[in-house]
Swiss-Prot record:
SS bonds (residue pairs): none
GO biological process per UniProt: chemotaxis
Top-rank EC class of the record's enzyme: hydrolase
Segments forming domain CheB-type methylesterase: 153-344
Record PTM 4-aspartylphosphate, positions in chain: D57
Family according to the record: Belongs to the CheB family.
Cited function: Involved in chemotaxis. Part of a chemotaxis signal transduction system that modulates chemotaxis in response to various stimuli. Catalyzes the demethylation of specific methylglutamate residues introduced into the chemoreceptors (methyl-accepting chemotaxis proteins or MCP) by CheR. Also mediates the irreversible deamidation of specific glutamine residues to glutamic acid.
Name of the molecule in the record: Protein-glutamate methylesterase/protein-glutamine glutaminase 2
Amino acid sequence: MSKKIKVLVVDDSPVFRALLSEIINSDPQLEVIGAAEDPYQAREMIKALKPDVLTLDIEMPKMNGVQFLKNLMRLHPLPVVMISTLTQHGADATLMALELGAVDYFPKPSVANTADMLGYRSLVNEKIRMAAQAQVGANQSMSPAVASSSAVSTSQYQLIAIGASTGGTEAVKHLLSALPASMPPIVITQHISAMFSGPFASRLDASCALSVSELTQGEVALKTNHAYVAPGDKHLMVFRRGGQLYAHLDDSPAVNRHKPSVDVMFGSVAESLKGKAIGVILTGMGKDGAQGMLQMKQQGAITVAQDEQSCVVYGMPRAAVECGAAMHIKPLNKLPQFLCDLLS
C-alpha cells in the first residue's frame, strides 16, 4: 500500500477543524496528522510532524493566514491549500496568497456549496492530493524578461487564447506582464470562482501594459491591446461577424467539470479563426483544453504548452502534449518572447 499524504489542518474554528479533518480522513490516500488553531501552534507542528500538505485558513486571530504563508514560504516552503471565504475581501486575500506561493484554494463550506456535500468532499480531497504533487515556487523562479515585438498590427495571427487552472493565476500574470502593449486581442479562461475572476482581472490590469478586464456582458467586440478574462461561472466563446471578432458568454453546462472551460473557448477559436490564432495552455490539473487545442492545431493555428519544469501542476499541458495538440513546448519565462516572435 502506498504511503498516505500527511495533512496538517490550520484553522481557528474547532468545529471546522473537526469537519475538515473528517472530510480529509475519509479519503484513503490522505491522513490528517494534526490540527492547529493558530499559526504559532502550526509552526511548532510543522517542525515536529513534517506534513506533506497544509490547509490554511485566511482569517485567523494573532496572525492572518496570508502573513503566516509569507513567513512559511521564506523559511519552510511546502504545498499549501488556502481556505477562503467567497467574499471580496476573501478574493483579494486568496489571490495574494496564490501570488506568495500557495498552490490552490477551496471555499469555506456554506449552505450554497455544501448542498452537494459529496461534491464538496471530492473537491477538497482532490485539491489536497494534487497539491502534494505540486512544484512549490515553480512560478516564483520563472519571471520572464519583458518581450519586445514589432509589426504586430500586420501579423497573420488575429487572436491569442490562453487556458490555465491550478497555478495559473500567477502564470498568466507572469506571461501578460512581460508582453508589450501592442498585441492582438487576448482571451483568457482561468479556472476560478465567480467571486474571484473580477479581482483577478483587476490585478492583471494593474501589472500589465495591456488593458485587462473581466468579460461581464453577453457580447463584446474584441480590441487589440486588450485582454479579456472569462468570468468564473460562464464559458467564454469567440466568434466572427463580418470582419470583426467578438467574445460572448455562454451559460451552457460545465465541460470537463469546468465552467468556464478551456475546451469550449479553444473550440470556438478553432471554428472562427482557423489558422489565424495562437493557443497557449498553462499549468493546471486535469485535461481541460487538450481537445480544444487539438481542434485549433487541426485548423492550422499555432499551439504551445508550458513545459513541465515551470508548471506548478503539469496536468493540462501534459494532456495537450500527449494527445499531439501542442506544436511547441516552452518554459514560462520564454513564452512572452516566443509569442512576440510569432507575431513579428
